[in-house]
Amino acid sequence: TLSSRYMIYTGLTILVFLIYHLYQYTLRVGYDPAQYTAFISDGKVETFDVYKMIVAGFSNVWCSAFYILAILMLFSHLRHGVQSIFQTVGADSRKIRPFYNFVAIAYGAVICLGFISVPVSVLLGIIK
């Protein structure tokens, strides 16, 4: 399939995305702690305001575009993976192939649409 043919490229794109994602949101590189600090428990506990960080990050069109591209690559990976699961357990007959192809596409689509909705909502001004 097309997904299996481009698995190496989609996989490398997802790897670069994961590194970037960890760099940006876990290591918090580029975020001023004073600007993105939230206080919880009556001001006694200080933590990063992840909501503000996400809105600031996805307000950048290029950041959002790369995120969306990586998630579309993830769709291809998930679809291929779910199809492979059915084949691995021996459920690869012509009779049920349309069913597991549907399940693979539906699973990948639900996961990816959920992830893509965040940057799209920020870009459209739904999340501010």
Q: What is each stretch, according to the model?
A:
Residues 1-128:
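Membrane-embedded alpha-helical bundles that constitute the cytochrome b-like, heme-associated redox core
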